Design a protein with these regions (language model features):
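Active-site-proximal or metal-binding-adjacent scaffold patches in catalytic folds
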Residues: 1-88, 97-125
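Walker B catalytic acidic pair
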Residues: 93
Length: 125
């Protein structure tokens, strides 16, 4: 049976994110493929629609955030990005679950996540 590369990538992404979230006590609603509308970024972490539309909810405190991860080149959707790039993007977006901005704490936690991925046996440049 020939399994498409993107299916394997999504399986791996979910497996890795589940391990990291369990270890660090993080939570999100779902991970979805990034769309062409988000072509300037490799990923995105955004609050769920319910929190976005509620005037009284601080979006940073949403427990049901949605992660978008790009796994293919925009100009060649059949060609996946390098695994290292995808895993770095995943670490960056998961870091937003704890540190919403791009400050020093976010960068430090992102590196901690990358190092944990390496300890789990994933190769990240």
């Amino acid at each position: 049976m020939n399994i498409p590369n993107s299916v394997v990538l999504w399986k791996d992404i979910h497996e890795i994110s589940d391990k990291l979230c369990k270890y660090y006590g993080l939570s999100y609603s779902k991970i979805v493929p990034e769309t062409r509308k988000q072509s300037r970024h490799f990923g995105e972490c955004r609050p769920c629609q319910k929190c976005c539309s509620a005037a009284h909810v601080d979006e940073r405190n949403c427990n049901e955030k949605i992660l978008s991860i790009r796994i293919h080149h925009l100009n060649n959707p059949r060609k996946p990005l390098a695994t290292s790039t995808i895993l770095r993007t995943l670490a960056h977006e998961l870091a937003h679950l704890r540190c919403w901005d791009h400050g020093k704490d976010h960068r430090a936690f992102e590196e901690e996540l990358v190092n944990h991925m390496r300890e789990l046996g994933y190769r990240i440049v």
